[in-house]
């Protein structure tokens, strides 16, 4: 069977647009679908490049005085060499990998134990090698902006540039934010422009609220907690 995705949310909405016997042809440019969905080839990861350039543009317009580096890497699916080289060259205080994650809200994918819906917000990785302090900062920004985050639990690897970034130098505090995507690695990938805009807003707010005194070292945080705990006991 050939699955036709128009971006509609119900049978009634679909039948207003197509009917049995309609002729279909391949569309080789991008196509806007219903409910603010975008279909195009290579959204993995051209949509990530767009998000990063738009974040940089807004950060500049807002005159946010922070050092922000954007890298479009090569070799993410193979050796990770682009991410390794860039991380060593820049040595960032922290890093966020931006990739895509498989959407499960299609009628032929019912073998998932979790849900990732297009238009329901960015995917935030929950993993042992995702820096917990950076994770909390992202969650706090999302709450402030009323942006829903869809958690994705990863064990050992995420199969993205994050797996290489966090191992460089003395260890780079890292996280992974993903854009929900249907039909990954096909010529008709689909994403939600609502999710795209929310990720842009989330990253801009995160950058704006970064401070040069911020620590992403969990051991430093534990020292502070231990001190507070001891002071509480003395009191």
Question: Where are the language model's segments positioned?
Answer:
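N-terminal hydrophobic/helix-forming segments and targeting peptides
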Residues: 1-235
């Amino acid at each position: 069977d050939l699955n036709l995705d128009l971006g509609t949310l119900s049978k009634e909405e679909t039948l207003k647009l197509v009917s049995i016997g309609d002729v279909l042809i391949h569309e080789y440019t991008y196509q806007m679908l219903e409910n603010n969905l975008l279909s195009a080839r290579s959204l993995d990861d051209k949509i990530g490049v767009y998000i990063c350039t738009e974040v940089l543009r807004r950060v500049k317009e807002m005159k946010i005085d922070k050092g922000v580096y954007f890298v479009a890497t090569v070799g993410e699916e193979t050796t990770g060499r682009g991410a390794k080289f860039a991380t060593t060259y820049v040595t960032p205080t922290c890093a966020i990998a931006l990739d895509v994650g498989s959407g499960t809200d299609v009628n032929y994918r019912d073998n998932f134990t979790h849900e990732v819906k297009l238009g329901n917000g960015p995917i935030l990785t929950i993993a042992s090698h995702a820096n917990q302090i950076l994770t909390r900062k992202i969650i706090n920004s999302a709450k402030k902006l009323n942006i829903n985050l869809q958690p994705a639990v990863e064990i050992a690897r995420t199969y993205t540039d994050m797996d290489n970034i966090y191992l460089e130098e003395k260890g780079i505090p890292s996280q992974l934010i993903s854009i929900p995507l249907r039909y990954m690695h096909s010529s008709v990938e689909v994403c939600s422009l609502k999710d795209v805009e929310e990720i842009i807003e989330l990253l801009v707010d995160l950058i704006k609220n970064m401070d040069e005194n911020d620590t992403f070292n969990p051991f430093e945080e534990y020292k502070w907690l231990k001190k507070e705990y001891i002071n509480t006991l003395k009191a």
